[in-house]
């Protein structure tokens, strides 16, 4: 899924990329090496330090995205917004509000790419939860495509495993 997301970002017409919850910068450092201008927000000062070492010219900010993006990031527009394994910390209602808030930050023909634990239906999620038993992380709130789609008709879902998917939302 990460390679597919990487290729999709590079296929965008522009190179301005916002990464939400970038961690150590594994994905964004690859994009940075391909001349993408990287912007990002992460909760952890340590993650920013590690990512900044890989991408000295990236514009990285500390902040809890569950409270919104920092003003500096809201002042820009992006060709691609990416979030990998980060937005599952938001409730379903927060996900909807957050995704709506991201749409104006996209340039014309821009896309938001979300790579995460995700399911097409609530039934698939519940089956996976049952199969996982005690290994299920109940602190994380995973994506259910069928429940997001009414709010975002342009949203697409591409499965990469029984529990991993790439959701794409075009402007």
What are these regions (language model features)?
Residues 94-97, 147:
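An acidic, carboxylate-rich microenvironment
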Residues 20:
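Conserved beta-strand/loop positions that form the S-adenosyl-L-methionine
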Residues 85-86:
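Short catalytic micro-motifs in class I SAM-dependent methyltransferases
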């Amino acid at each position: 899924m990460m390679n597919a997301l990487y290729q999709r970002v590079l296929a965008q017409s522009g190179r301005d990329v916002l990464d939400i919850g970038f961690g150590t910068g594994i994905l964004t450092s690859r994009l940075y090496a391909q001349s993408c201008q990287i912007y990002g927000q992460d909760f952890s000062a340590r993650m920013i330090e590690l990512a900044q070492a890989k991408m000295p010219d990236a514009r990285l900010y500390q902040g809890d995205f569950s409270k919104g993006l920092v003003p500096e990031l809201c002042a820009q527009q992006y060709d691609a917004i990416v979030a990998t394994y980060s937005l599952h910390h938001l409730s379903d209602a927060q996900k909807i509000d957050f995704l709506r808030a991201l749409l104006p930050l996209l340039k014309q023909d821009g896309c938001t790419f979300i790579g995460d634990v995700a399911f097409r239906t609530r039934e698939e999620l519940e089956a996976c939860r049952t199969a996982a038993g005690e290994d299920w992380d109940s602190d994380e709130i995973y994506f259910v495509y069928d429940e997001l789609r009414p709010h975002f008709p342009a949203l697409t879902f591409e499965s990469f495993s029984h529990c991993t998917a790439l959701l794409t939302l075009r402007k």
